[in-house]
Each structure stands twice: as structure tokens, then as C-alpha cells.
Amino acid sequence: MPRIIGIDIPAKKKLKISLTYIYGIGPALSEEIIAKLQLNPEARAAELTEEEIGRLNSLLQSDYVVEGDLRRRVQSDIKRLISIHAYRGQRHRLSLPVRGQRTKTNSRTRKGKRKTVAGKKK
């Protein structure tokens, strides 16, 4: 398993797919990186030479925000929204959907397991 910026990527998968195992790199960015470094997109990750891995590491560290830095940036953005009392920040704080989805039904992922409320007595 080749190790790129501290992450083990799958050796048997094609390079385009293997790079997507790094947080912050999707299929489009993976293709862009491969084109920029002039690597063979059909090659397997195990076929990378030490020199190519070094070029890949240096490019990702210098030009892209990925892995821990990206996770920290996202968390700091959420904390900033909460601290300035923005609507989106309040939705994050209350663990509710942030982007305007309905909450009367659905949104169970954000709200968590159902909490039973006693029925109204007649």
C-alpha cells in the first residue's frame, strides 16, 4: 500500500480511485492531480515509483488543503458560524438540518433517534 501524505491508499485499485481515499479529494480533483503530474490514470497505485510518490506528496502539501487541515478548517468554519450567531450556526448547534430541509418529518440522521413524547390527555 503506497503511503501518500500519511494515508495508506489501496494498491490494487487504479490511481484515480485510490486518490479518492484521501479526505478532500474526489474523482474530479483526482483526475486534475493526475493530469498535472502527467501520471498514467490507468496505472495501479502499487505501480507508482518512489519519485512519483514524492511528487504527489509535495503537490498535495503545497497546492491543496486535504486531510487534517481540511477537517480543521471545516470545524473552525462551523465554530465561527456558531460564535457570530448566524442562522446556519444555530442550526449546527441544535443538530438540525442546515440547508433548509423540512424537519416535521424526515431529518432523522441529524436529529438522532426518536424521543417519545407523552400524548395529550382529554
UniProtKB/Swiss-Prot annotation:
InterPro entries cross-referenced by the UniProt entry: Rbsml_uS13_C (IPR027437), Ribosomal_uS13 (IPR001892), Ribosomal_uS13-like_H2TH (IPR010979), Ribosomal_uS13_bac-type (IPR019980), Ribosomal_uS13_CS (IPR018269)
Biased composition range(s): Basic residues: 101-122
Listed Pfam families: Ribosomal_S13 (PF00416)
SUPFAM superfamilies per UniProt: S13-like H2TH domain
Keywords: Ribonucleoprotein, Ribosomal protein, RNA-binding, rRNA-binding, tRNA-binding
Statement: the UniProt record of this protein carries the keyword Mitochondrion: no
GO molecular function: rRNA binding; structural constituent of ribosome; tRNA binding
Annotated segments matching region Disordered: 93-122
GO CC terms of this entry: cytosol; small ribosomal subunit
HAMAP family according to UniProt: Ribosomal_uS13
Entry's family note: Belongs to the universal ribosomal protein uS13 family.
Protein name, per record: Small ribosomal subunit protein uS13
